[in-house]
């Protein structure tokens, strides 16, 4: 069985036992997270939401909280010798999908 969930403005296809790297979610390591924005549930029967599947949810456990790799943002103005270099590390959460309720 699999599901398509929406979190952090992105959509992810998940199955039970998968590890999922998402935008930062509130909670400590070991806490349980309920993802209620389920767009589709597949398996023996396929249920497609309009836009969400009613009474469907995905339960996950927070495995790790941390930051992604650094990305560099470089801005310059042509012919002005004006340059700006910034670094950014996005906060992220790693979940282990435990159960899909459909």
Curated annotation (Swiss-Prot):
Domain of life the protein comes from: Bacteria
Pfam families the UniProt entry points to: Ribosomal_L21p (PF00829)
GO cellular component: cytoplasm; ribonucleoprotein complex; ribosome
GO MF annotation list: rRNA binding; structural constituent of ribosome
An example Gene Ontology biological process: translation
InterPro entries in the cross-refs: bL21-like (IPR028909), bL21-like_sf (IPR036164), Ribosomal_bL21 (IPR001787), Ribosomal_bL21_CS (IPR018258)
Keywords: Ribonucleoprotein, Ribosomal protein, RNA-binding, rRNA-binding
Family from the record: Belongs to the bacterial ribosomal protein bL21 family.
Subunit field text: Part of the 50S ribosomal subunit. Contacts protein L20.
Function field: This protein binds to 23S rRNA in the presence of protein L20.
Protein's name according to its UniProt entry: Large ribosomal subunit protein bL21
Organism field: Geotalea daltonii (strain DSM 22248 / JCM 15807 / FRC-32) (Geobacter daltonii)
Underlying gene: rplU
